[in-house]
Amino acid sequence: MRTALTIAGSDSGGGAGIQADLKTFSAFGVFGKTVITSITSQNTLGVQAVDDLPVGVVESQLKSIFEDDKCQAVKTGMLGNEQIVDRVASLLKRYRVKKLVVDPVIFSTSGKKLLTLSGVEMMKKRLLPLAYLVTPNIREAEILSGIKIRRPADRKRAAREILKTGVRAVVLTGGHLKGK
């Protein structure tokens, strides 16, 4: 059976994070493994609290997965802070992960900040160069690229700028462009 690992936050409401990733994996016949980076208290009304796990706990989970079995693919989601991003990137590099998809979760749908500014910079410097694909929404693409996205041509410019980090492909996800 195919296996994939998701490295992300836990969503108590079940609509995002690890819980949503596992549902998606299962729908495609993929056995999902998890590394939890943060625990959130959230529901359909928004995010009430976020608690990042200690870096050592994240590292222990990752080592436990990779020392036992390889995964065909790895996806990252909410990573929380610079230290977690740095450690995850180091371990993914050490274990030579080839199929890495980065969902650069910076804000929740309701607007709560989920990754520190230093975490964003660490992601650009250490994690994106390891990735095959990055899937930012419009707001995340603006932050990663430094380009304001107002029209379709801006999307292409932002994607090209993100490619300069070393990631091999960029897919801007929709639903966040004003007026569309």
Residue positions per predicted region:
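Helix C-cap/helix->beta junction micro-motif
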Residues: 28, 95-96, 130, 166
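Non-cysteine beta-strand/loop elements that form the S-adenosyl-L-methionine
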Residues: 33-37, 99-104, 127-139
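Anionic group-transfer/hydrolysis microenvironments
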Residues: 8, 77-79, 105, 139, ...
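Small-residue (G/A/S/T)-rich helix-start motifs and N-terminal tracts that mark the onset
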Residues: 1-73, 153-180
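Short, glycine/charged-enriched secondary-structure capping and boundary segments
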Residues: 20-22, 48-50, 88-91, 114-117, ...
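Glycine/small-residue-rich loop that forms an oxyanion/phosphate-binding "nest" at active or ligand-binding sites
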Residues: 66-129
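Conserved phosphate/ATP/ADP-binding segment of small-molecule kinases
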Residues: 117-180
